Amino acid sequence: MLIAMDATRPNDLGDGKLGRRFYVICESDRSFRAISAGHGGGRDLKGIADFANGKRCAKNFGNAMDSRLTAGGAYVTGETKTSFKGYYRVSAKQDATLLRSFVQFDGEGETANARQRAIGGHPAELLSNVCLRKDLHSPYADGEGYVPFGKLVVYAGGRSDGCTSWSPSDAGQIIPMMKDKPTTLYIYP
């Protein structure tokens, strides 16, 4: 399997339509898929330099720590970790657990800082407006019995701050393909 992303292609086509700029090529079953992927954030250092990227096309790339930019170049996928992010409400009487998987990317040269920057691929979902809730029976509770509780936000097509992010449904198909199977990824440029 080969995966690639053209970060210069638009992520946002307007009118709520997402651009397809992430490609999965599987030679064994002769298949090709093009899906959307989140856009890099970058940073606007007021009065110094503006490295921010918009939703249309990325124009700034980098591998510096804290840059929130995607580095173009070759990567190999590493280990997959799944971590507890917190609980969120799905109905008046039901909460759900957000467990989010993350595929670590490793690189050399222009992508050498990927591991130190925690650059990888993950579902485009997070919790916002997080507070701590006492839940002594949760296996995820901290030493004092508290767990994060917030509102689920799916940001497919949103900022990824240097990582590659996919809709939760696409991530559910892509991440298992990479798990325990080092895969080559190329991000253009």
Positions of PLM-derived features:
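Cell wall/extracellular polymer interaction/catalysis modules
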Residues: 1-161, 169-177, 181-189
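A conserved hydrophobic position in a structured secondary element of the catalytic/binding core
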Residues: 166
